[in-house]
Amino acid sequence: MKIMIDFGHPYFEENVLLGLTPDDLSCFYADASEVDRLNLFFVLEASLHRLQGKERMKTAAYCAFLMAYYLFIALTPPASFELAEFYIDRALELDETPEYCQWKAIIDEGN
């Protein structure tokens, strides 16, 4: 799925978010400008807050998982391990799935 950053609509709708995959995030990172690479994180963050406010916890968990993946694999900012750990733990608090547990183990190995 092609990811677009839209300042007029700075979050993903639930159906769009659920259509995103970790590969989509990696492809976006490879093709985007440095600014848009960072902006994607903030769009995901805004989406997470919006979903939690609407009590859409399974989708919020998926968003937190995508954030952990993006921080740990693609973006790798300073403290990426700690930040990714925070978001994968949040995903697991909201919806404990085998996929999130597997990623927790990967993240816990460090980068």
Please place each PLM-identified region on the residue numbering.
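TPR/TPR-like (Sel1-like) alpha-helical repeat modules
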Residues: 81-96, 105
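Long, ordered, amphipathic alpha-helical scaffolds
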Residues: 2-3
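Helix-turn-helix repeat elements of alpha-solenoid scaffolds
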Residues: 32-47, 77-83
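Amphipathic alpha-helical repeat scaffolds of TPR domains
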Residues: 6-35, 56-73, 98-110
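Flexible helix-coil transition and linker loops at the boundaries of alpha-helical arrays
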Residues: 45-60, 91-100
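A short acidic, glycine/proline-enriched capping/turn motif at secondary-structure boundaries
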Residues: 70, 75-77, 93
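Generic alpha-helix detector with strongest preference for long hydrophobic helices that associate
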Residues: 25, 48-49, 56, 81, ...
